[in-house]
């Protein structure tokens, strides 16, 4: 038994407390206290449902020098995540039931965050032959995606949506037009021209989202079941507007935004620092503000990290050669708690929802509200500020564009089904 005393509760329904939360048998037993072997003082902290990340690259199999299941899932629980969706662009790609099953079994044995693998939409992520969606789902896959690559063949995407629809599986897309994106390393515009760097235009994202929404319309018309499209790492104002219009028209589309697109802009590239090189690229301030509005009005369903670890040597290469990607599992919530809630008054209830019930809805999972009988997959968050220090990361990627930023809202206790998987109590 664990008793968390004098703690505020925050979930998608709102805030309440302070209360005394008794945990046992993997569930919340009482909100009125009780006898417990371990007592945690929650004074000044708040308790939330465990977070779910829809989009993380754990690099296993094939690139364990960058990250592996242990380091990635340990980073996850240190970031307050009890559940995580791993992307399939590994080496080899996760495109068979056997590969999905192997990941699930290894992750379960580690006893950290619960892993929910995404499987490739097409064999080897080559964009040609569809993978066996039903068998992948039986093995544990929760969505289909060729993330890391773009879906260039609209016919293949349509067939994938039609295949996934009766299974209730969402199809997630990395929405960039490869012909427009070309070799861009930062947002296309005056700053890229000034710096002499190849640009990736915002129209590359908007054009691909527009096409994919038309493909979704086609699949919706042709399928007796409901196809579900999920747009990954939205980065532009126009892309957001397209998703907003589609939702208002009743299309079954969901979308996510990342911590880096919500807190950073292309201005960070003035230093030519590859730490800020990410795909899609950091955009302008107008795009960032549009994303924040999308969080509030429901256009964006979830905040997803797109955690993308690389080796230190790779990220120290010059900007043109360094790989795309930012590691963020361990700082995502503190970053947005500080930058959005504390500094801008973004509602805490809504912020927590974007880390919990929002991503759960994308996967078709029920909400986790804090009440008696609820599964005790929880995170205790401390508002006390401390600086970001990537040298203390559990992730193998011990670098960060937010190094030195003073943030509050750090996870100090993470539980999965009542088991403590991370503890950093003072």
From Swiss-Prot:
The entry's Zn(2+) 2-binding residues are 147, 174, 233
Provide the binding site for Zn(2+) 1: 55, 57, 147, 306
- Cysteines paired by S-S bonds: none
Record: active site: 306
According to UniProt, this protein's pathway is: Pyrimidine metabolism; UMP biosynthesis via de novo pathway; (S)-dihydroorotate from bicarbonate: step 3/3
| E.C. code | 3.5.2.3
Cofactor remark: Binds 2 Zn(2+) ions per subunit.
Q: What keywords are annotated for this sequence in UniProt?
A: Hydrolase, Metal-binding, Pyrimidine biosynthesis, Zinc
Q: Which GO terms describe its biological process?
A: 'de novo' UMP biosynthetic process; purine nucleobase catabolic process
Q: Which cofactor does it need?
A: Zn(2+)
One MF term from GO for this chain?
A: dihydroorotase activity
Sites where the protein binds substrate: 57-59, 89, 310, 324-325
Highest taxon, organism lineage: Bacteria
Q: What is the enzyme's main class? A: hydrolase
Sorted alphabetically, the Gene Ontology cellular component annotations on this record are: cytoplasm
Answer yes or no on keyword Cell division: no
- Which family, according to the similarity comment? Belongs to the metallo-dependent hydrolases superfamily. DHOase family. Class I DHOase subfamily.
Q: What does this protein do?
A: Catalyzes the reversible cyclization of carbamoyl aspartate to dihydroorotate.
Give the protein's recorded name. Answer: Dihydroorotase
């Amino acid at each position: 038994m664990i008793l968390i005393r004098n703690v505020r509760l925050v979930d998608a329904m709102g805030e309440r407390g302070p209360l005394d939360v008794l945990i046992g048998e993997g569930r919340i037993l009482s909100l009125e206290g009780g006898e417990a072997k371990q007592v945690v003082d929650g004074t000044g902290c708040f308790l939330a449902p465990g977070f779910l990340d829809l989009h993380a690259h754990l690099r296993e199999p094939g690139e364990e020098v960058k990250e592996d299941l242990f380091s990635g899932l340990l980073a996850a629980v240190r970031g307050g995540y009890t559940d995580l969706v791993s992307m399939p662009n590994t080496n080899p790609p996760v495109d068979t039931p056997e590969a999905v099953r192997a990941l699930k079994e290894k992750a379960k044995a580690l006893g950290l965050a619960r892993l929910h693998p995404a499987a490739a939409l097409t064999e080897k992520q080559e964009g040609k032959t569809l993978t066996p969606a039903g068998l992948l789902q039986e093995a544990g896959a929760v969505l289909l995606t060729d993330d890391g690559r773009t879906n260039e063949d609209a016919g293949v995407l349509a067939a994938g949506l039609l295949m996934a629809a009766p299974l209730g599986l969402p199809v997630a897309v990395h929405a960039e037009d490869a012909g427009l994106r070309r070799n861009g390393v930062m947002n296309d515009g005056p700053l890229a021209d000034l710096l002499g760097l190849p640009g990736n235009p915002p129209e590359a994202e908007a054009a691909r989202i527009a096409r994919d929404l038309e493909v979704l319309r086609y699949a919706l018309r042709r399928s007796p079941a409901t196809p579900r499209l999920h747009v990954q790492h939205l980065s532009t104002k126009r892309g957001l507007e397209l998703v907003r219009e589609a939702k208002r028209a009743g299309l079954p589309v969901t979308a996510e935004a990342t911590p880096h697109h919500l807190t950073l802009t292309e201005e960070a590239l003035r230093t030519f620092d590859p730490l800020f090189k990410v795909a899609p690229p950091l955009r302008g301030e107008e795009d960032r503000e549009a994303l924040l509005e999308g969080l509030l009005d429901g256009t964006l369903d979830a905040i997803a990290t797109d955690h993308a670890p690389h080796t230190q040597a790779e990220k120290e290469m010059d900007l043109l050669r360094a790989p795309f990607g930012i590691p963020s599992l361990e700082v995502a919530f503190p970053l947005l708690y500080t930058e959005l809630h504390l500094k801008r008054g973004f509602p805490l209830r809504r912020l927590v929802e974007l880390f919990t019930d929002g991503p759960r809805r994308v996967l078709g999972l029920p909400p986790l509200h804090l009440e008696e009988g609820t599964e005790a997959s929880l995170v205790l968050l401390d508002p006390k500020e401390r600086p970001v220090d990537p040298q203390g990361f559990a992730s193998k990627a011990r670098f960060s564009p937010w190094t030195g930023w003073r943030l509050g809202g750090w996870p100090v206790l993470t539980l999965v089904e009542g088991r403590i998987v991370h503890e950093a109590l003072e």
